[in-house]
Amino acid sequence: MQFPAFYVTGTDTGIGKTVASTALLHAVRARGHTAVGMKPVASGCVATPQGWHNEDALALQAASQPQPDYATLNPYALPAALAPELAAADVGVTLSLVPLQQALAQLRAQAEVVVVEGVGGWAAPLSAQLDQADLVRALQLPVVLVVGVRLGCINHARLTAAAIAADGLRCIGWIANEIDPQMERIEDNIRMLGQRLAMPCWGRIPWRPNAQAEGLAQHIRLPE
């Protein structure tokens, strides 16, 4: 695989980063590679006998082969469904890059490909001192942008791509994720996205609210 690890970000929160990330994991596995997910920071967790667990991180774990230890996949699991900076402060946690670098190194030793899912949109901070760009720089990862296809997505996608570039980071691909089944002229919007985003399209995920990640993998177009 050309990119053994990459960071999945989005044009906003709630636009389907986890849907895209789990589909990517299955698509990589369908090519015969081992692949594991990672959710460095997750807010909005539930208490379990094993500790705080997050729904999105569990989805990444389920789509991984081999399945990594949860604490390695999601080093910072924060209870409150708030921005990470607020959720961490609520429980007295200070986010640090070193544990995340160590966790990624462990995951890369376990699998050929690691799909790292970010939080919210690109500019959503991790803490008062850390932006996602700082994390991606520390992990030395390229970026894949998930575009939630709805009214306003062209503006959001262009702004996000420009912000990634301004941060000195490389966006290697984008994925169209259809999240509004009532959107008018969706084909025109996706065509315009393709014309205006400089990186290749890695796929178009159709609106299927109850679809399984393995089935959605067929809509992913991985680079050779």
Curated annotation (Swiss-Prot):
Q: Which residues are listed for Mg(2+) binding in this entry?
A: T18, D56, E117
Q: Does the keyword DNA damage apply?
A: no
| Record InterPro entries | DTB_synth_BioD, P-loop_NTPase
Any Pfam family the entry gives: AAA_26
Q: What is the superkingdom listed in this entry's lineage? A: Bacteria
- Provide the protein's localization: Cytoplasm
| Sequence positions that bind substrate | S43
Which cofactor does the UniProt annotation name? Mg(2+)
The biological pathway it contributes to is:
Cofactor biosynthesis; biotin biosynthesis; biotin from 7,8-diaminononanoate: step 1/2
Which top class of enzyme applies to this chain?
ligase
Annotated active site residues, numbered on this chain, are K39
Q: Which GO terms describe its biological process?
A: biotin biosynthetic process
The protein's UniProt keywords, in alphabetical order, are: ATP-binding, Biotin biosynthesis, Cytoplasm, Ligase, Magnesium, Metal-binding, Nucleotide-binding
Q: Where does ATP bind?
A: G14, I15, G16, K17, T18, V19, D56, E117, G118, V119, G120, N177, E178
For this protein, the record's NCBIfam families field holds: bioD
Q: What does this protein do?
A: Catalyzes a mechanistically unusual reaction, the ATP-dependent insertion of CO2 between the N7 and N8 nitrogen atoms of 7,8-diaminopelargonic acid (DAPA, also called 7,8-diammoniononanoate) to form a ureido ring.
Q: Which HAMAP family match?
A: BioD
* Family per similarity comment: Belongs to the dethiobiotin synthetase family.
Query: How does it associate, per the subunit comment?
Result: Homodimer.
Q: What is this protein called?
A: ATP-dependent dethiobiotin synthetase BioD
Q: Organism, per UniProt?
A: Xanthomonas campestris pv. campestris (strain 8004)
